[in-house]
Amino acid sequence: QEAEFNDICDCHGSNVGDVFSRYLGDDIIGARSLNFTKGTKLLMQLDEWCNYIFPGIAVRVEKTGSQMYKLKMRNDVAPNVGFGITYALPILVSGLTIPEGGMLIVENPEAHLHAKAQSNMGYFLARMAAAGVRVIIETHSEHIVNGIRRMIVERKTEMSHEDMTIYFFQNKNEEKDIIEIT
């Protein structure tokens, strides 16, 4: 099945607003949901995950036209959060909206994130995998891996260490070694 125009975020996070507005009223349930304290709708779950990864951050939507929305981030804590939210938002929206069985490929999800936020991003990506999304991550961050491991250890889903494979790529004498770490 072909995706409709602006139905998915591309590798640069483009179309995140279109994707968000398209699925705004959808329920996010099961392993994808962090909890239900604010509700099950996409906006509420995006707000929960943003606050989990970036404590003190709140997501709000303002309707600016018949089919136009403005996504606003409110920061109650730090005045200089940086670019981390900008890089994380497309990952969060993609993870929450991609269909079960779909594939989410993420390059350097740790970009511009503090160590704790990196770990929480790994946790988020593991929860998406537990919900049936095929997740491929290219990372240099042990914190991302530790977040994935933490999700498995907490046993909040049926996912186990056997459902995850980590590969370490190493250049040796102009040859590439691929080492499986599980």
Where are these regions (language model features)?
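The start of beta-strands in P-loop NTPase/AAA+ ATPase cores
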Residues: G102-M103
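Phosphate-coordinating catalytic segments in nucleotide- and nucleic-acid-processing enzymes
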Residues: Q1-A88, S94, P99, T182
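Short, charged/polar micro-motifs that form catalytic or ligand-binding hotspots
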Residues: F36, A78, A111-H112, R134-E138
